[in-house]
């Protein structure tokens, strides 16, 4: 629950807004009233840690900020006092136990210990693939943390690759995918390029509200797009949902033929603006050893 607000505006309110999106991913049934009550409680909690709108968070240490357990205990105090407002978010308090003391506490209940001073950083959350609810929360936290680091950095050139980006697309919480859409627009002005990738177009386009489909918005604002082979039903879905028209030749290029997956790997349609070409990615010998042979880097023959 540390400093991840924007450098412009009010960092505390920006942080609380980010936290509310994360809490909605934990508790998708949260309504507007519950969100308002929780935001009020979060402001009180930060005040308890001597953090308010006037605080210069840049001078604080990581350990100066509250963690999940602090929020859980703070809400428990509200419960003990019999506050009527607490009864409106009692279900959320119950769910929060898993993240503060229970099953997921080792992952989320603590101060940030990530060091991204290395010029190449890889956040691996593969171990969470069978815990989709937790995976989505962690994915969003990583994205918000990286955005904070870029916005508050020195604007040196950087590149952010977001693999399996459909993970963040929750039909019940479109705000998470909207966050990615907003990040793509914002980070460009901080000299950061963003490349989202997904192998599930249906999931990627599942997050929408009354205003727009945020997965579609992410795709539409991309200056370059690369469509790799997919099932014919996914091609039809893409045409229908994105109002796209592929020629028969183009459909052939991006449709998986059963039994030929390895042969078609790396082939697809590459879009730059309104122009599109058939393209094939060819790996170098070193890349083949790393990717297909799964060799440790120390054993790679150069």
Regions found by a protein language model. Give the residues of each.
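Extended active-site and interfacial segments that coordinate phosphate-rich ligands
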Residues: 295-297
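Short, solvent-exposed amphipathic alpha-helical segments in soluble enzyme
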Residues: 138-141, 242-244, 286
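Short, surface-exposed polybasic-aromatic patches that bind anionic ligands, especially phosphate groups
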Residues: 281-292
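Conserved ATP-driven motor cores of ASCE-family P-loop NTPases powering translocation/secretion/packaging/pilus
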Residues: 1-30, 172-282
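P-loop NTPase motor domains
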Residues: 1-192, 260-263, 270-272
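Acidic, low-complexity intrinsically disordered tails
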Residues: 299-302
